Amino acid sequence: MAMAQKLSHLLPSLRQVIQEPQLSLQPEPVFTVDRAEVPPLFWKPYIYAGYRPLHQTWRFYFRTLFQQHNEAVNVWTHLLAALVLLLRLALFVETVDFWGDPHALPLFIIVLASFTYLSFSALAHLLQAKSEFWHYSFFFLDYVGVAVYQFGSALAHFYYAIEPAWHAQVQAVFLPMAAFLAWLSCIGSCYNKYIQKPGLLGRTCQEVPSVLAYALDISPVVHRIFVSSDPTTDDPALLYHKCQVVFFLLAAAFFSTFMPERWFPGSCHVFGQGHQLFHIFLVLCTLAQLEAVALDYEARRPIYEPLHTHWPHNFSGLFLLTVGSSILTAFLLSQLVQRKLDQKTK
């Protein structure tokens, strides 16, 4: 009888032990919400669902890497491309003497710059939903990556792809102007994000410096395409250069027009957004560009070695200056954002 009483007291306590962990478990967080449940800062044109809730843990946002939401494709397009670039760099290391060949440094810089913009972009699209401050800050970081890539592209084109005639015209100003325009592009993009004005002023701040930077950066390639119009010329890199131009123009078109989601409002929450197509064509542009630059590095040494015997400017210093000034710009704008948000909460 005493044993039965002890067991009757023990069984409820065992049931409590089993049930308590179940009661203590928090409900699984909701991974996506409608547009009305997030601030207007996070809204995308014509996208009404698939947003991630704010103010979750960092672990939550990293877990969304494997969930469906309206930024998932943007994350994976650039994340996978960054991994492909690491594999491409491993192949370069087997065939290119980066330490012993001084002419290989621009090739390394363009690979590094490409990996930087792709990884920064993937990080921004993955984590920007944490809060308003982090939304601004991560996209400022994204614009730093774009500026770094702009200068890396300019350097690679100027070093390997340029024809002697165009080199003679622009050698004194090309790289300093490329560094300045890359930084100006970073400033314009960050400022446009900061002021949050979708009209003419915002687009001018972001797009005009970027257009000027691209026009300068791609000029050695365009000049070479026009002067190498002979179809019998054995220049396999030229096809890749043409492809990178076409892919970039397609990317720019989708970036600027919000197509096709403007044709199907409310139907492109996960797939089919213009920004996703912008990412895809930009990745194709970068991969074609790297193949062209690699071919030029191997085949055009008799052309570019004499051109770069004496440097009017230190391109490594200009690269570091572009990186440093862009990071400083993003940091200062993030501080302004913090002040603006603090004033809003008072």
Swiss-Prot record:
Subcellular location: Cell membrane
InterPro entries recorded: AdipoR/HlyIII-related
Segment forming the signal sequence: none
Cytoplasmic side, ranges: 1-72, 125-137, 191-237, 298-316
Parts of the chain that traverse the membrane: 73-93, 104-124, 138-158, 170-190, 238-258, 277-297, 317-337
Pfam families: HlyIII
Keywords recorded for this protein, A-Z: Cell membrane, Developmental protein, Differentiation, Lipid-binding, Membrane, Oogenesis, Receptor, Steroid-binding, Transmembrane, Transmembrane helix
GO biological process, one term: oogenesis
A GO term from the CC aspect: plasma membrane
Tissues of expression: Expressed in a wide range of tissues including ovary, testis, placenta, uterus and bladder.
Membrane topology, record value: Multi-pass membrane protein
Recorded family membership: Belongs to the ADIPOR family.
Role, per record: Plasma membrane progesterone (P4) receptor coupled to G proteins. Seems to act through a G(i) mediated pathway. May be involved in oocyte maturation. Involved in neurosteroid inhibition of apoptosis. Also binds dehydroepiandrosterone (DHEA), pregnanolone, pregnenolone and allopregnanolone.
Name this polypeptide is given: Membrane progestin receptor alpha
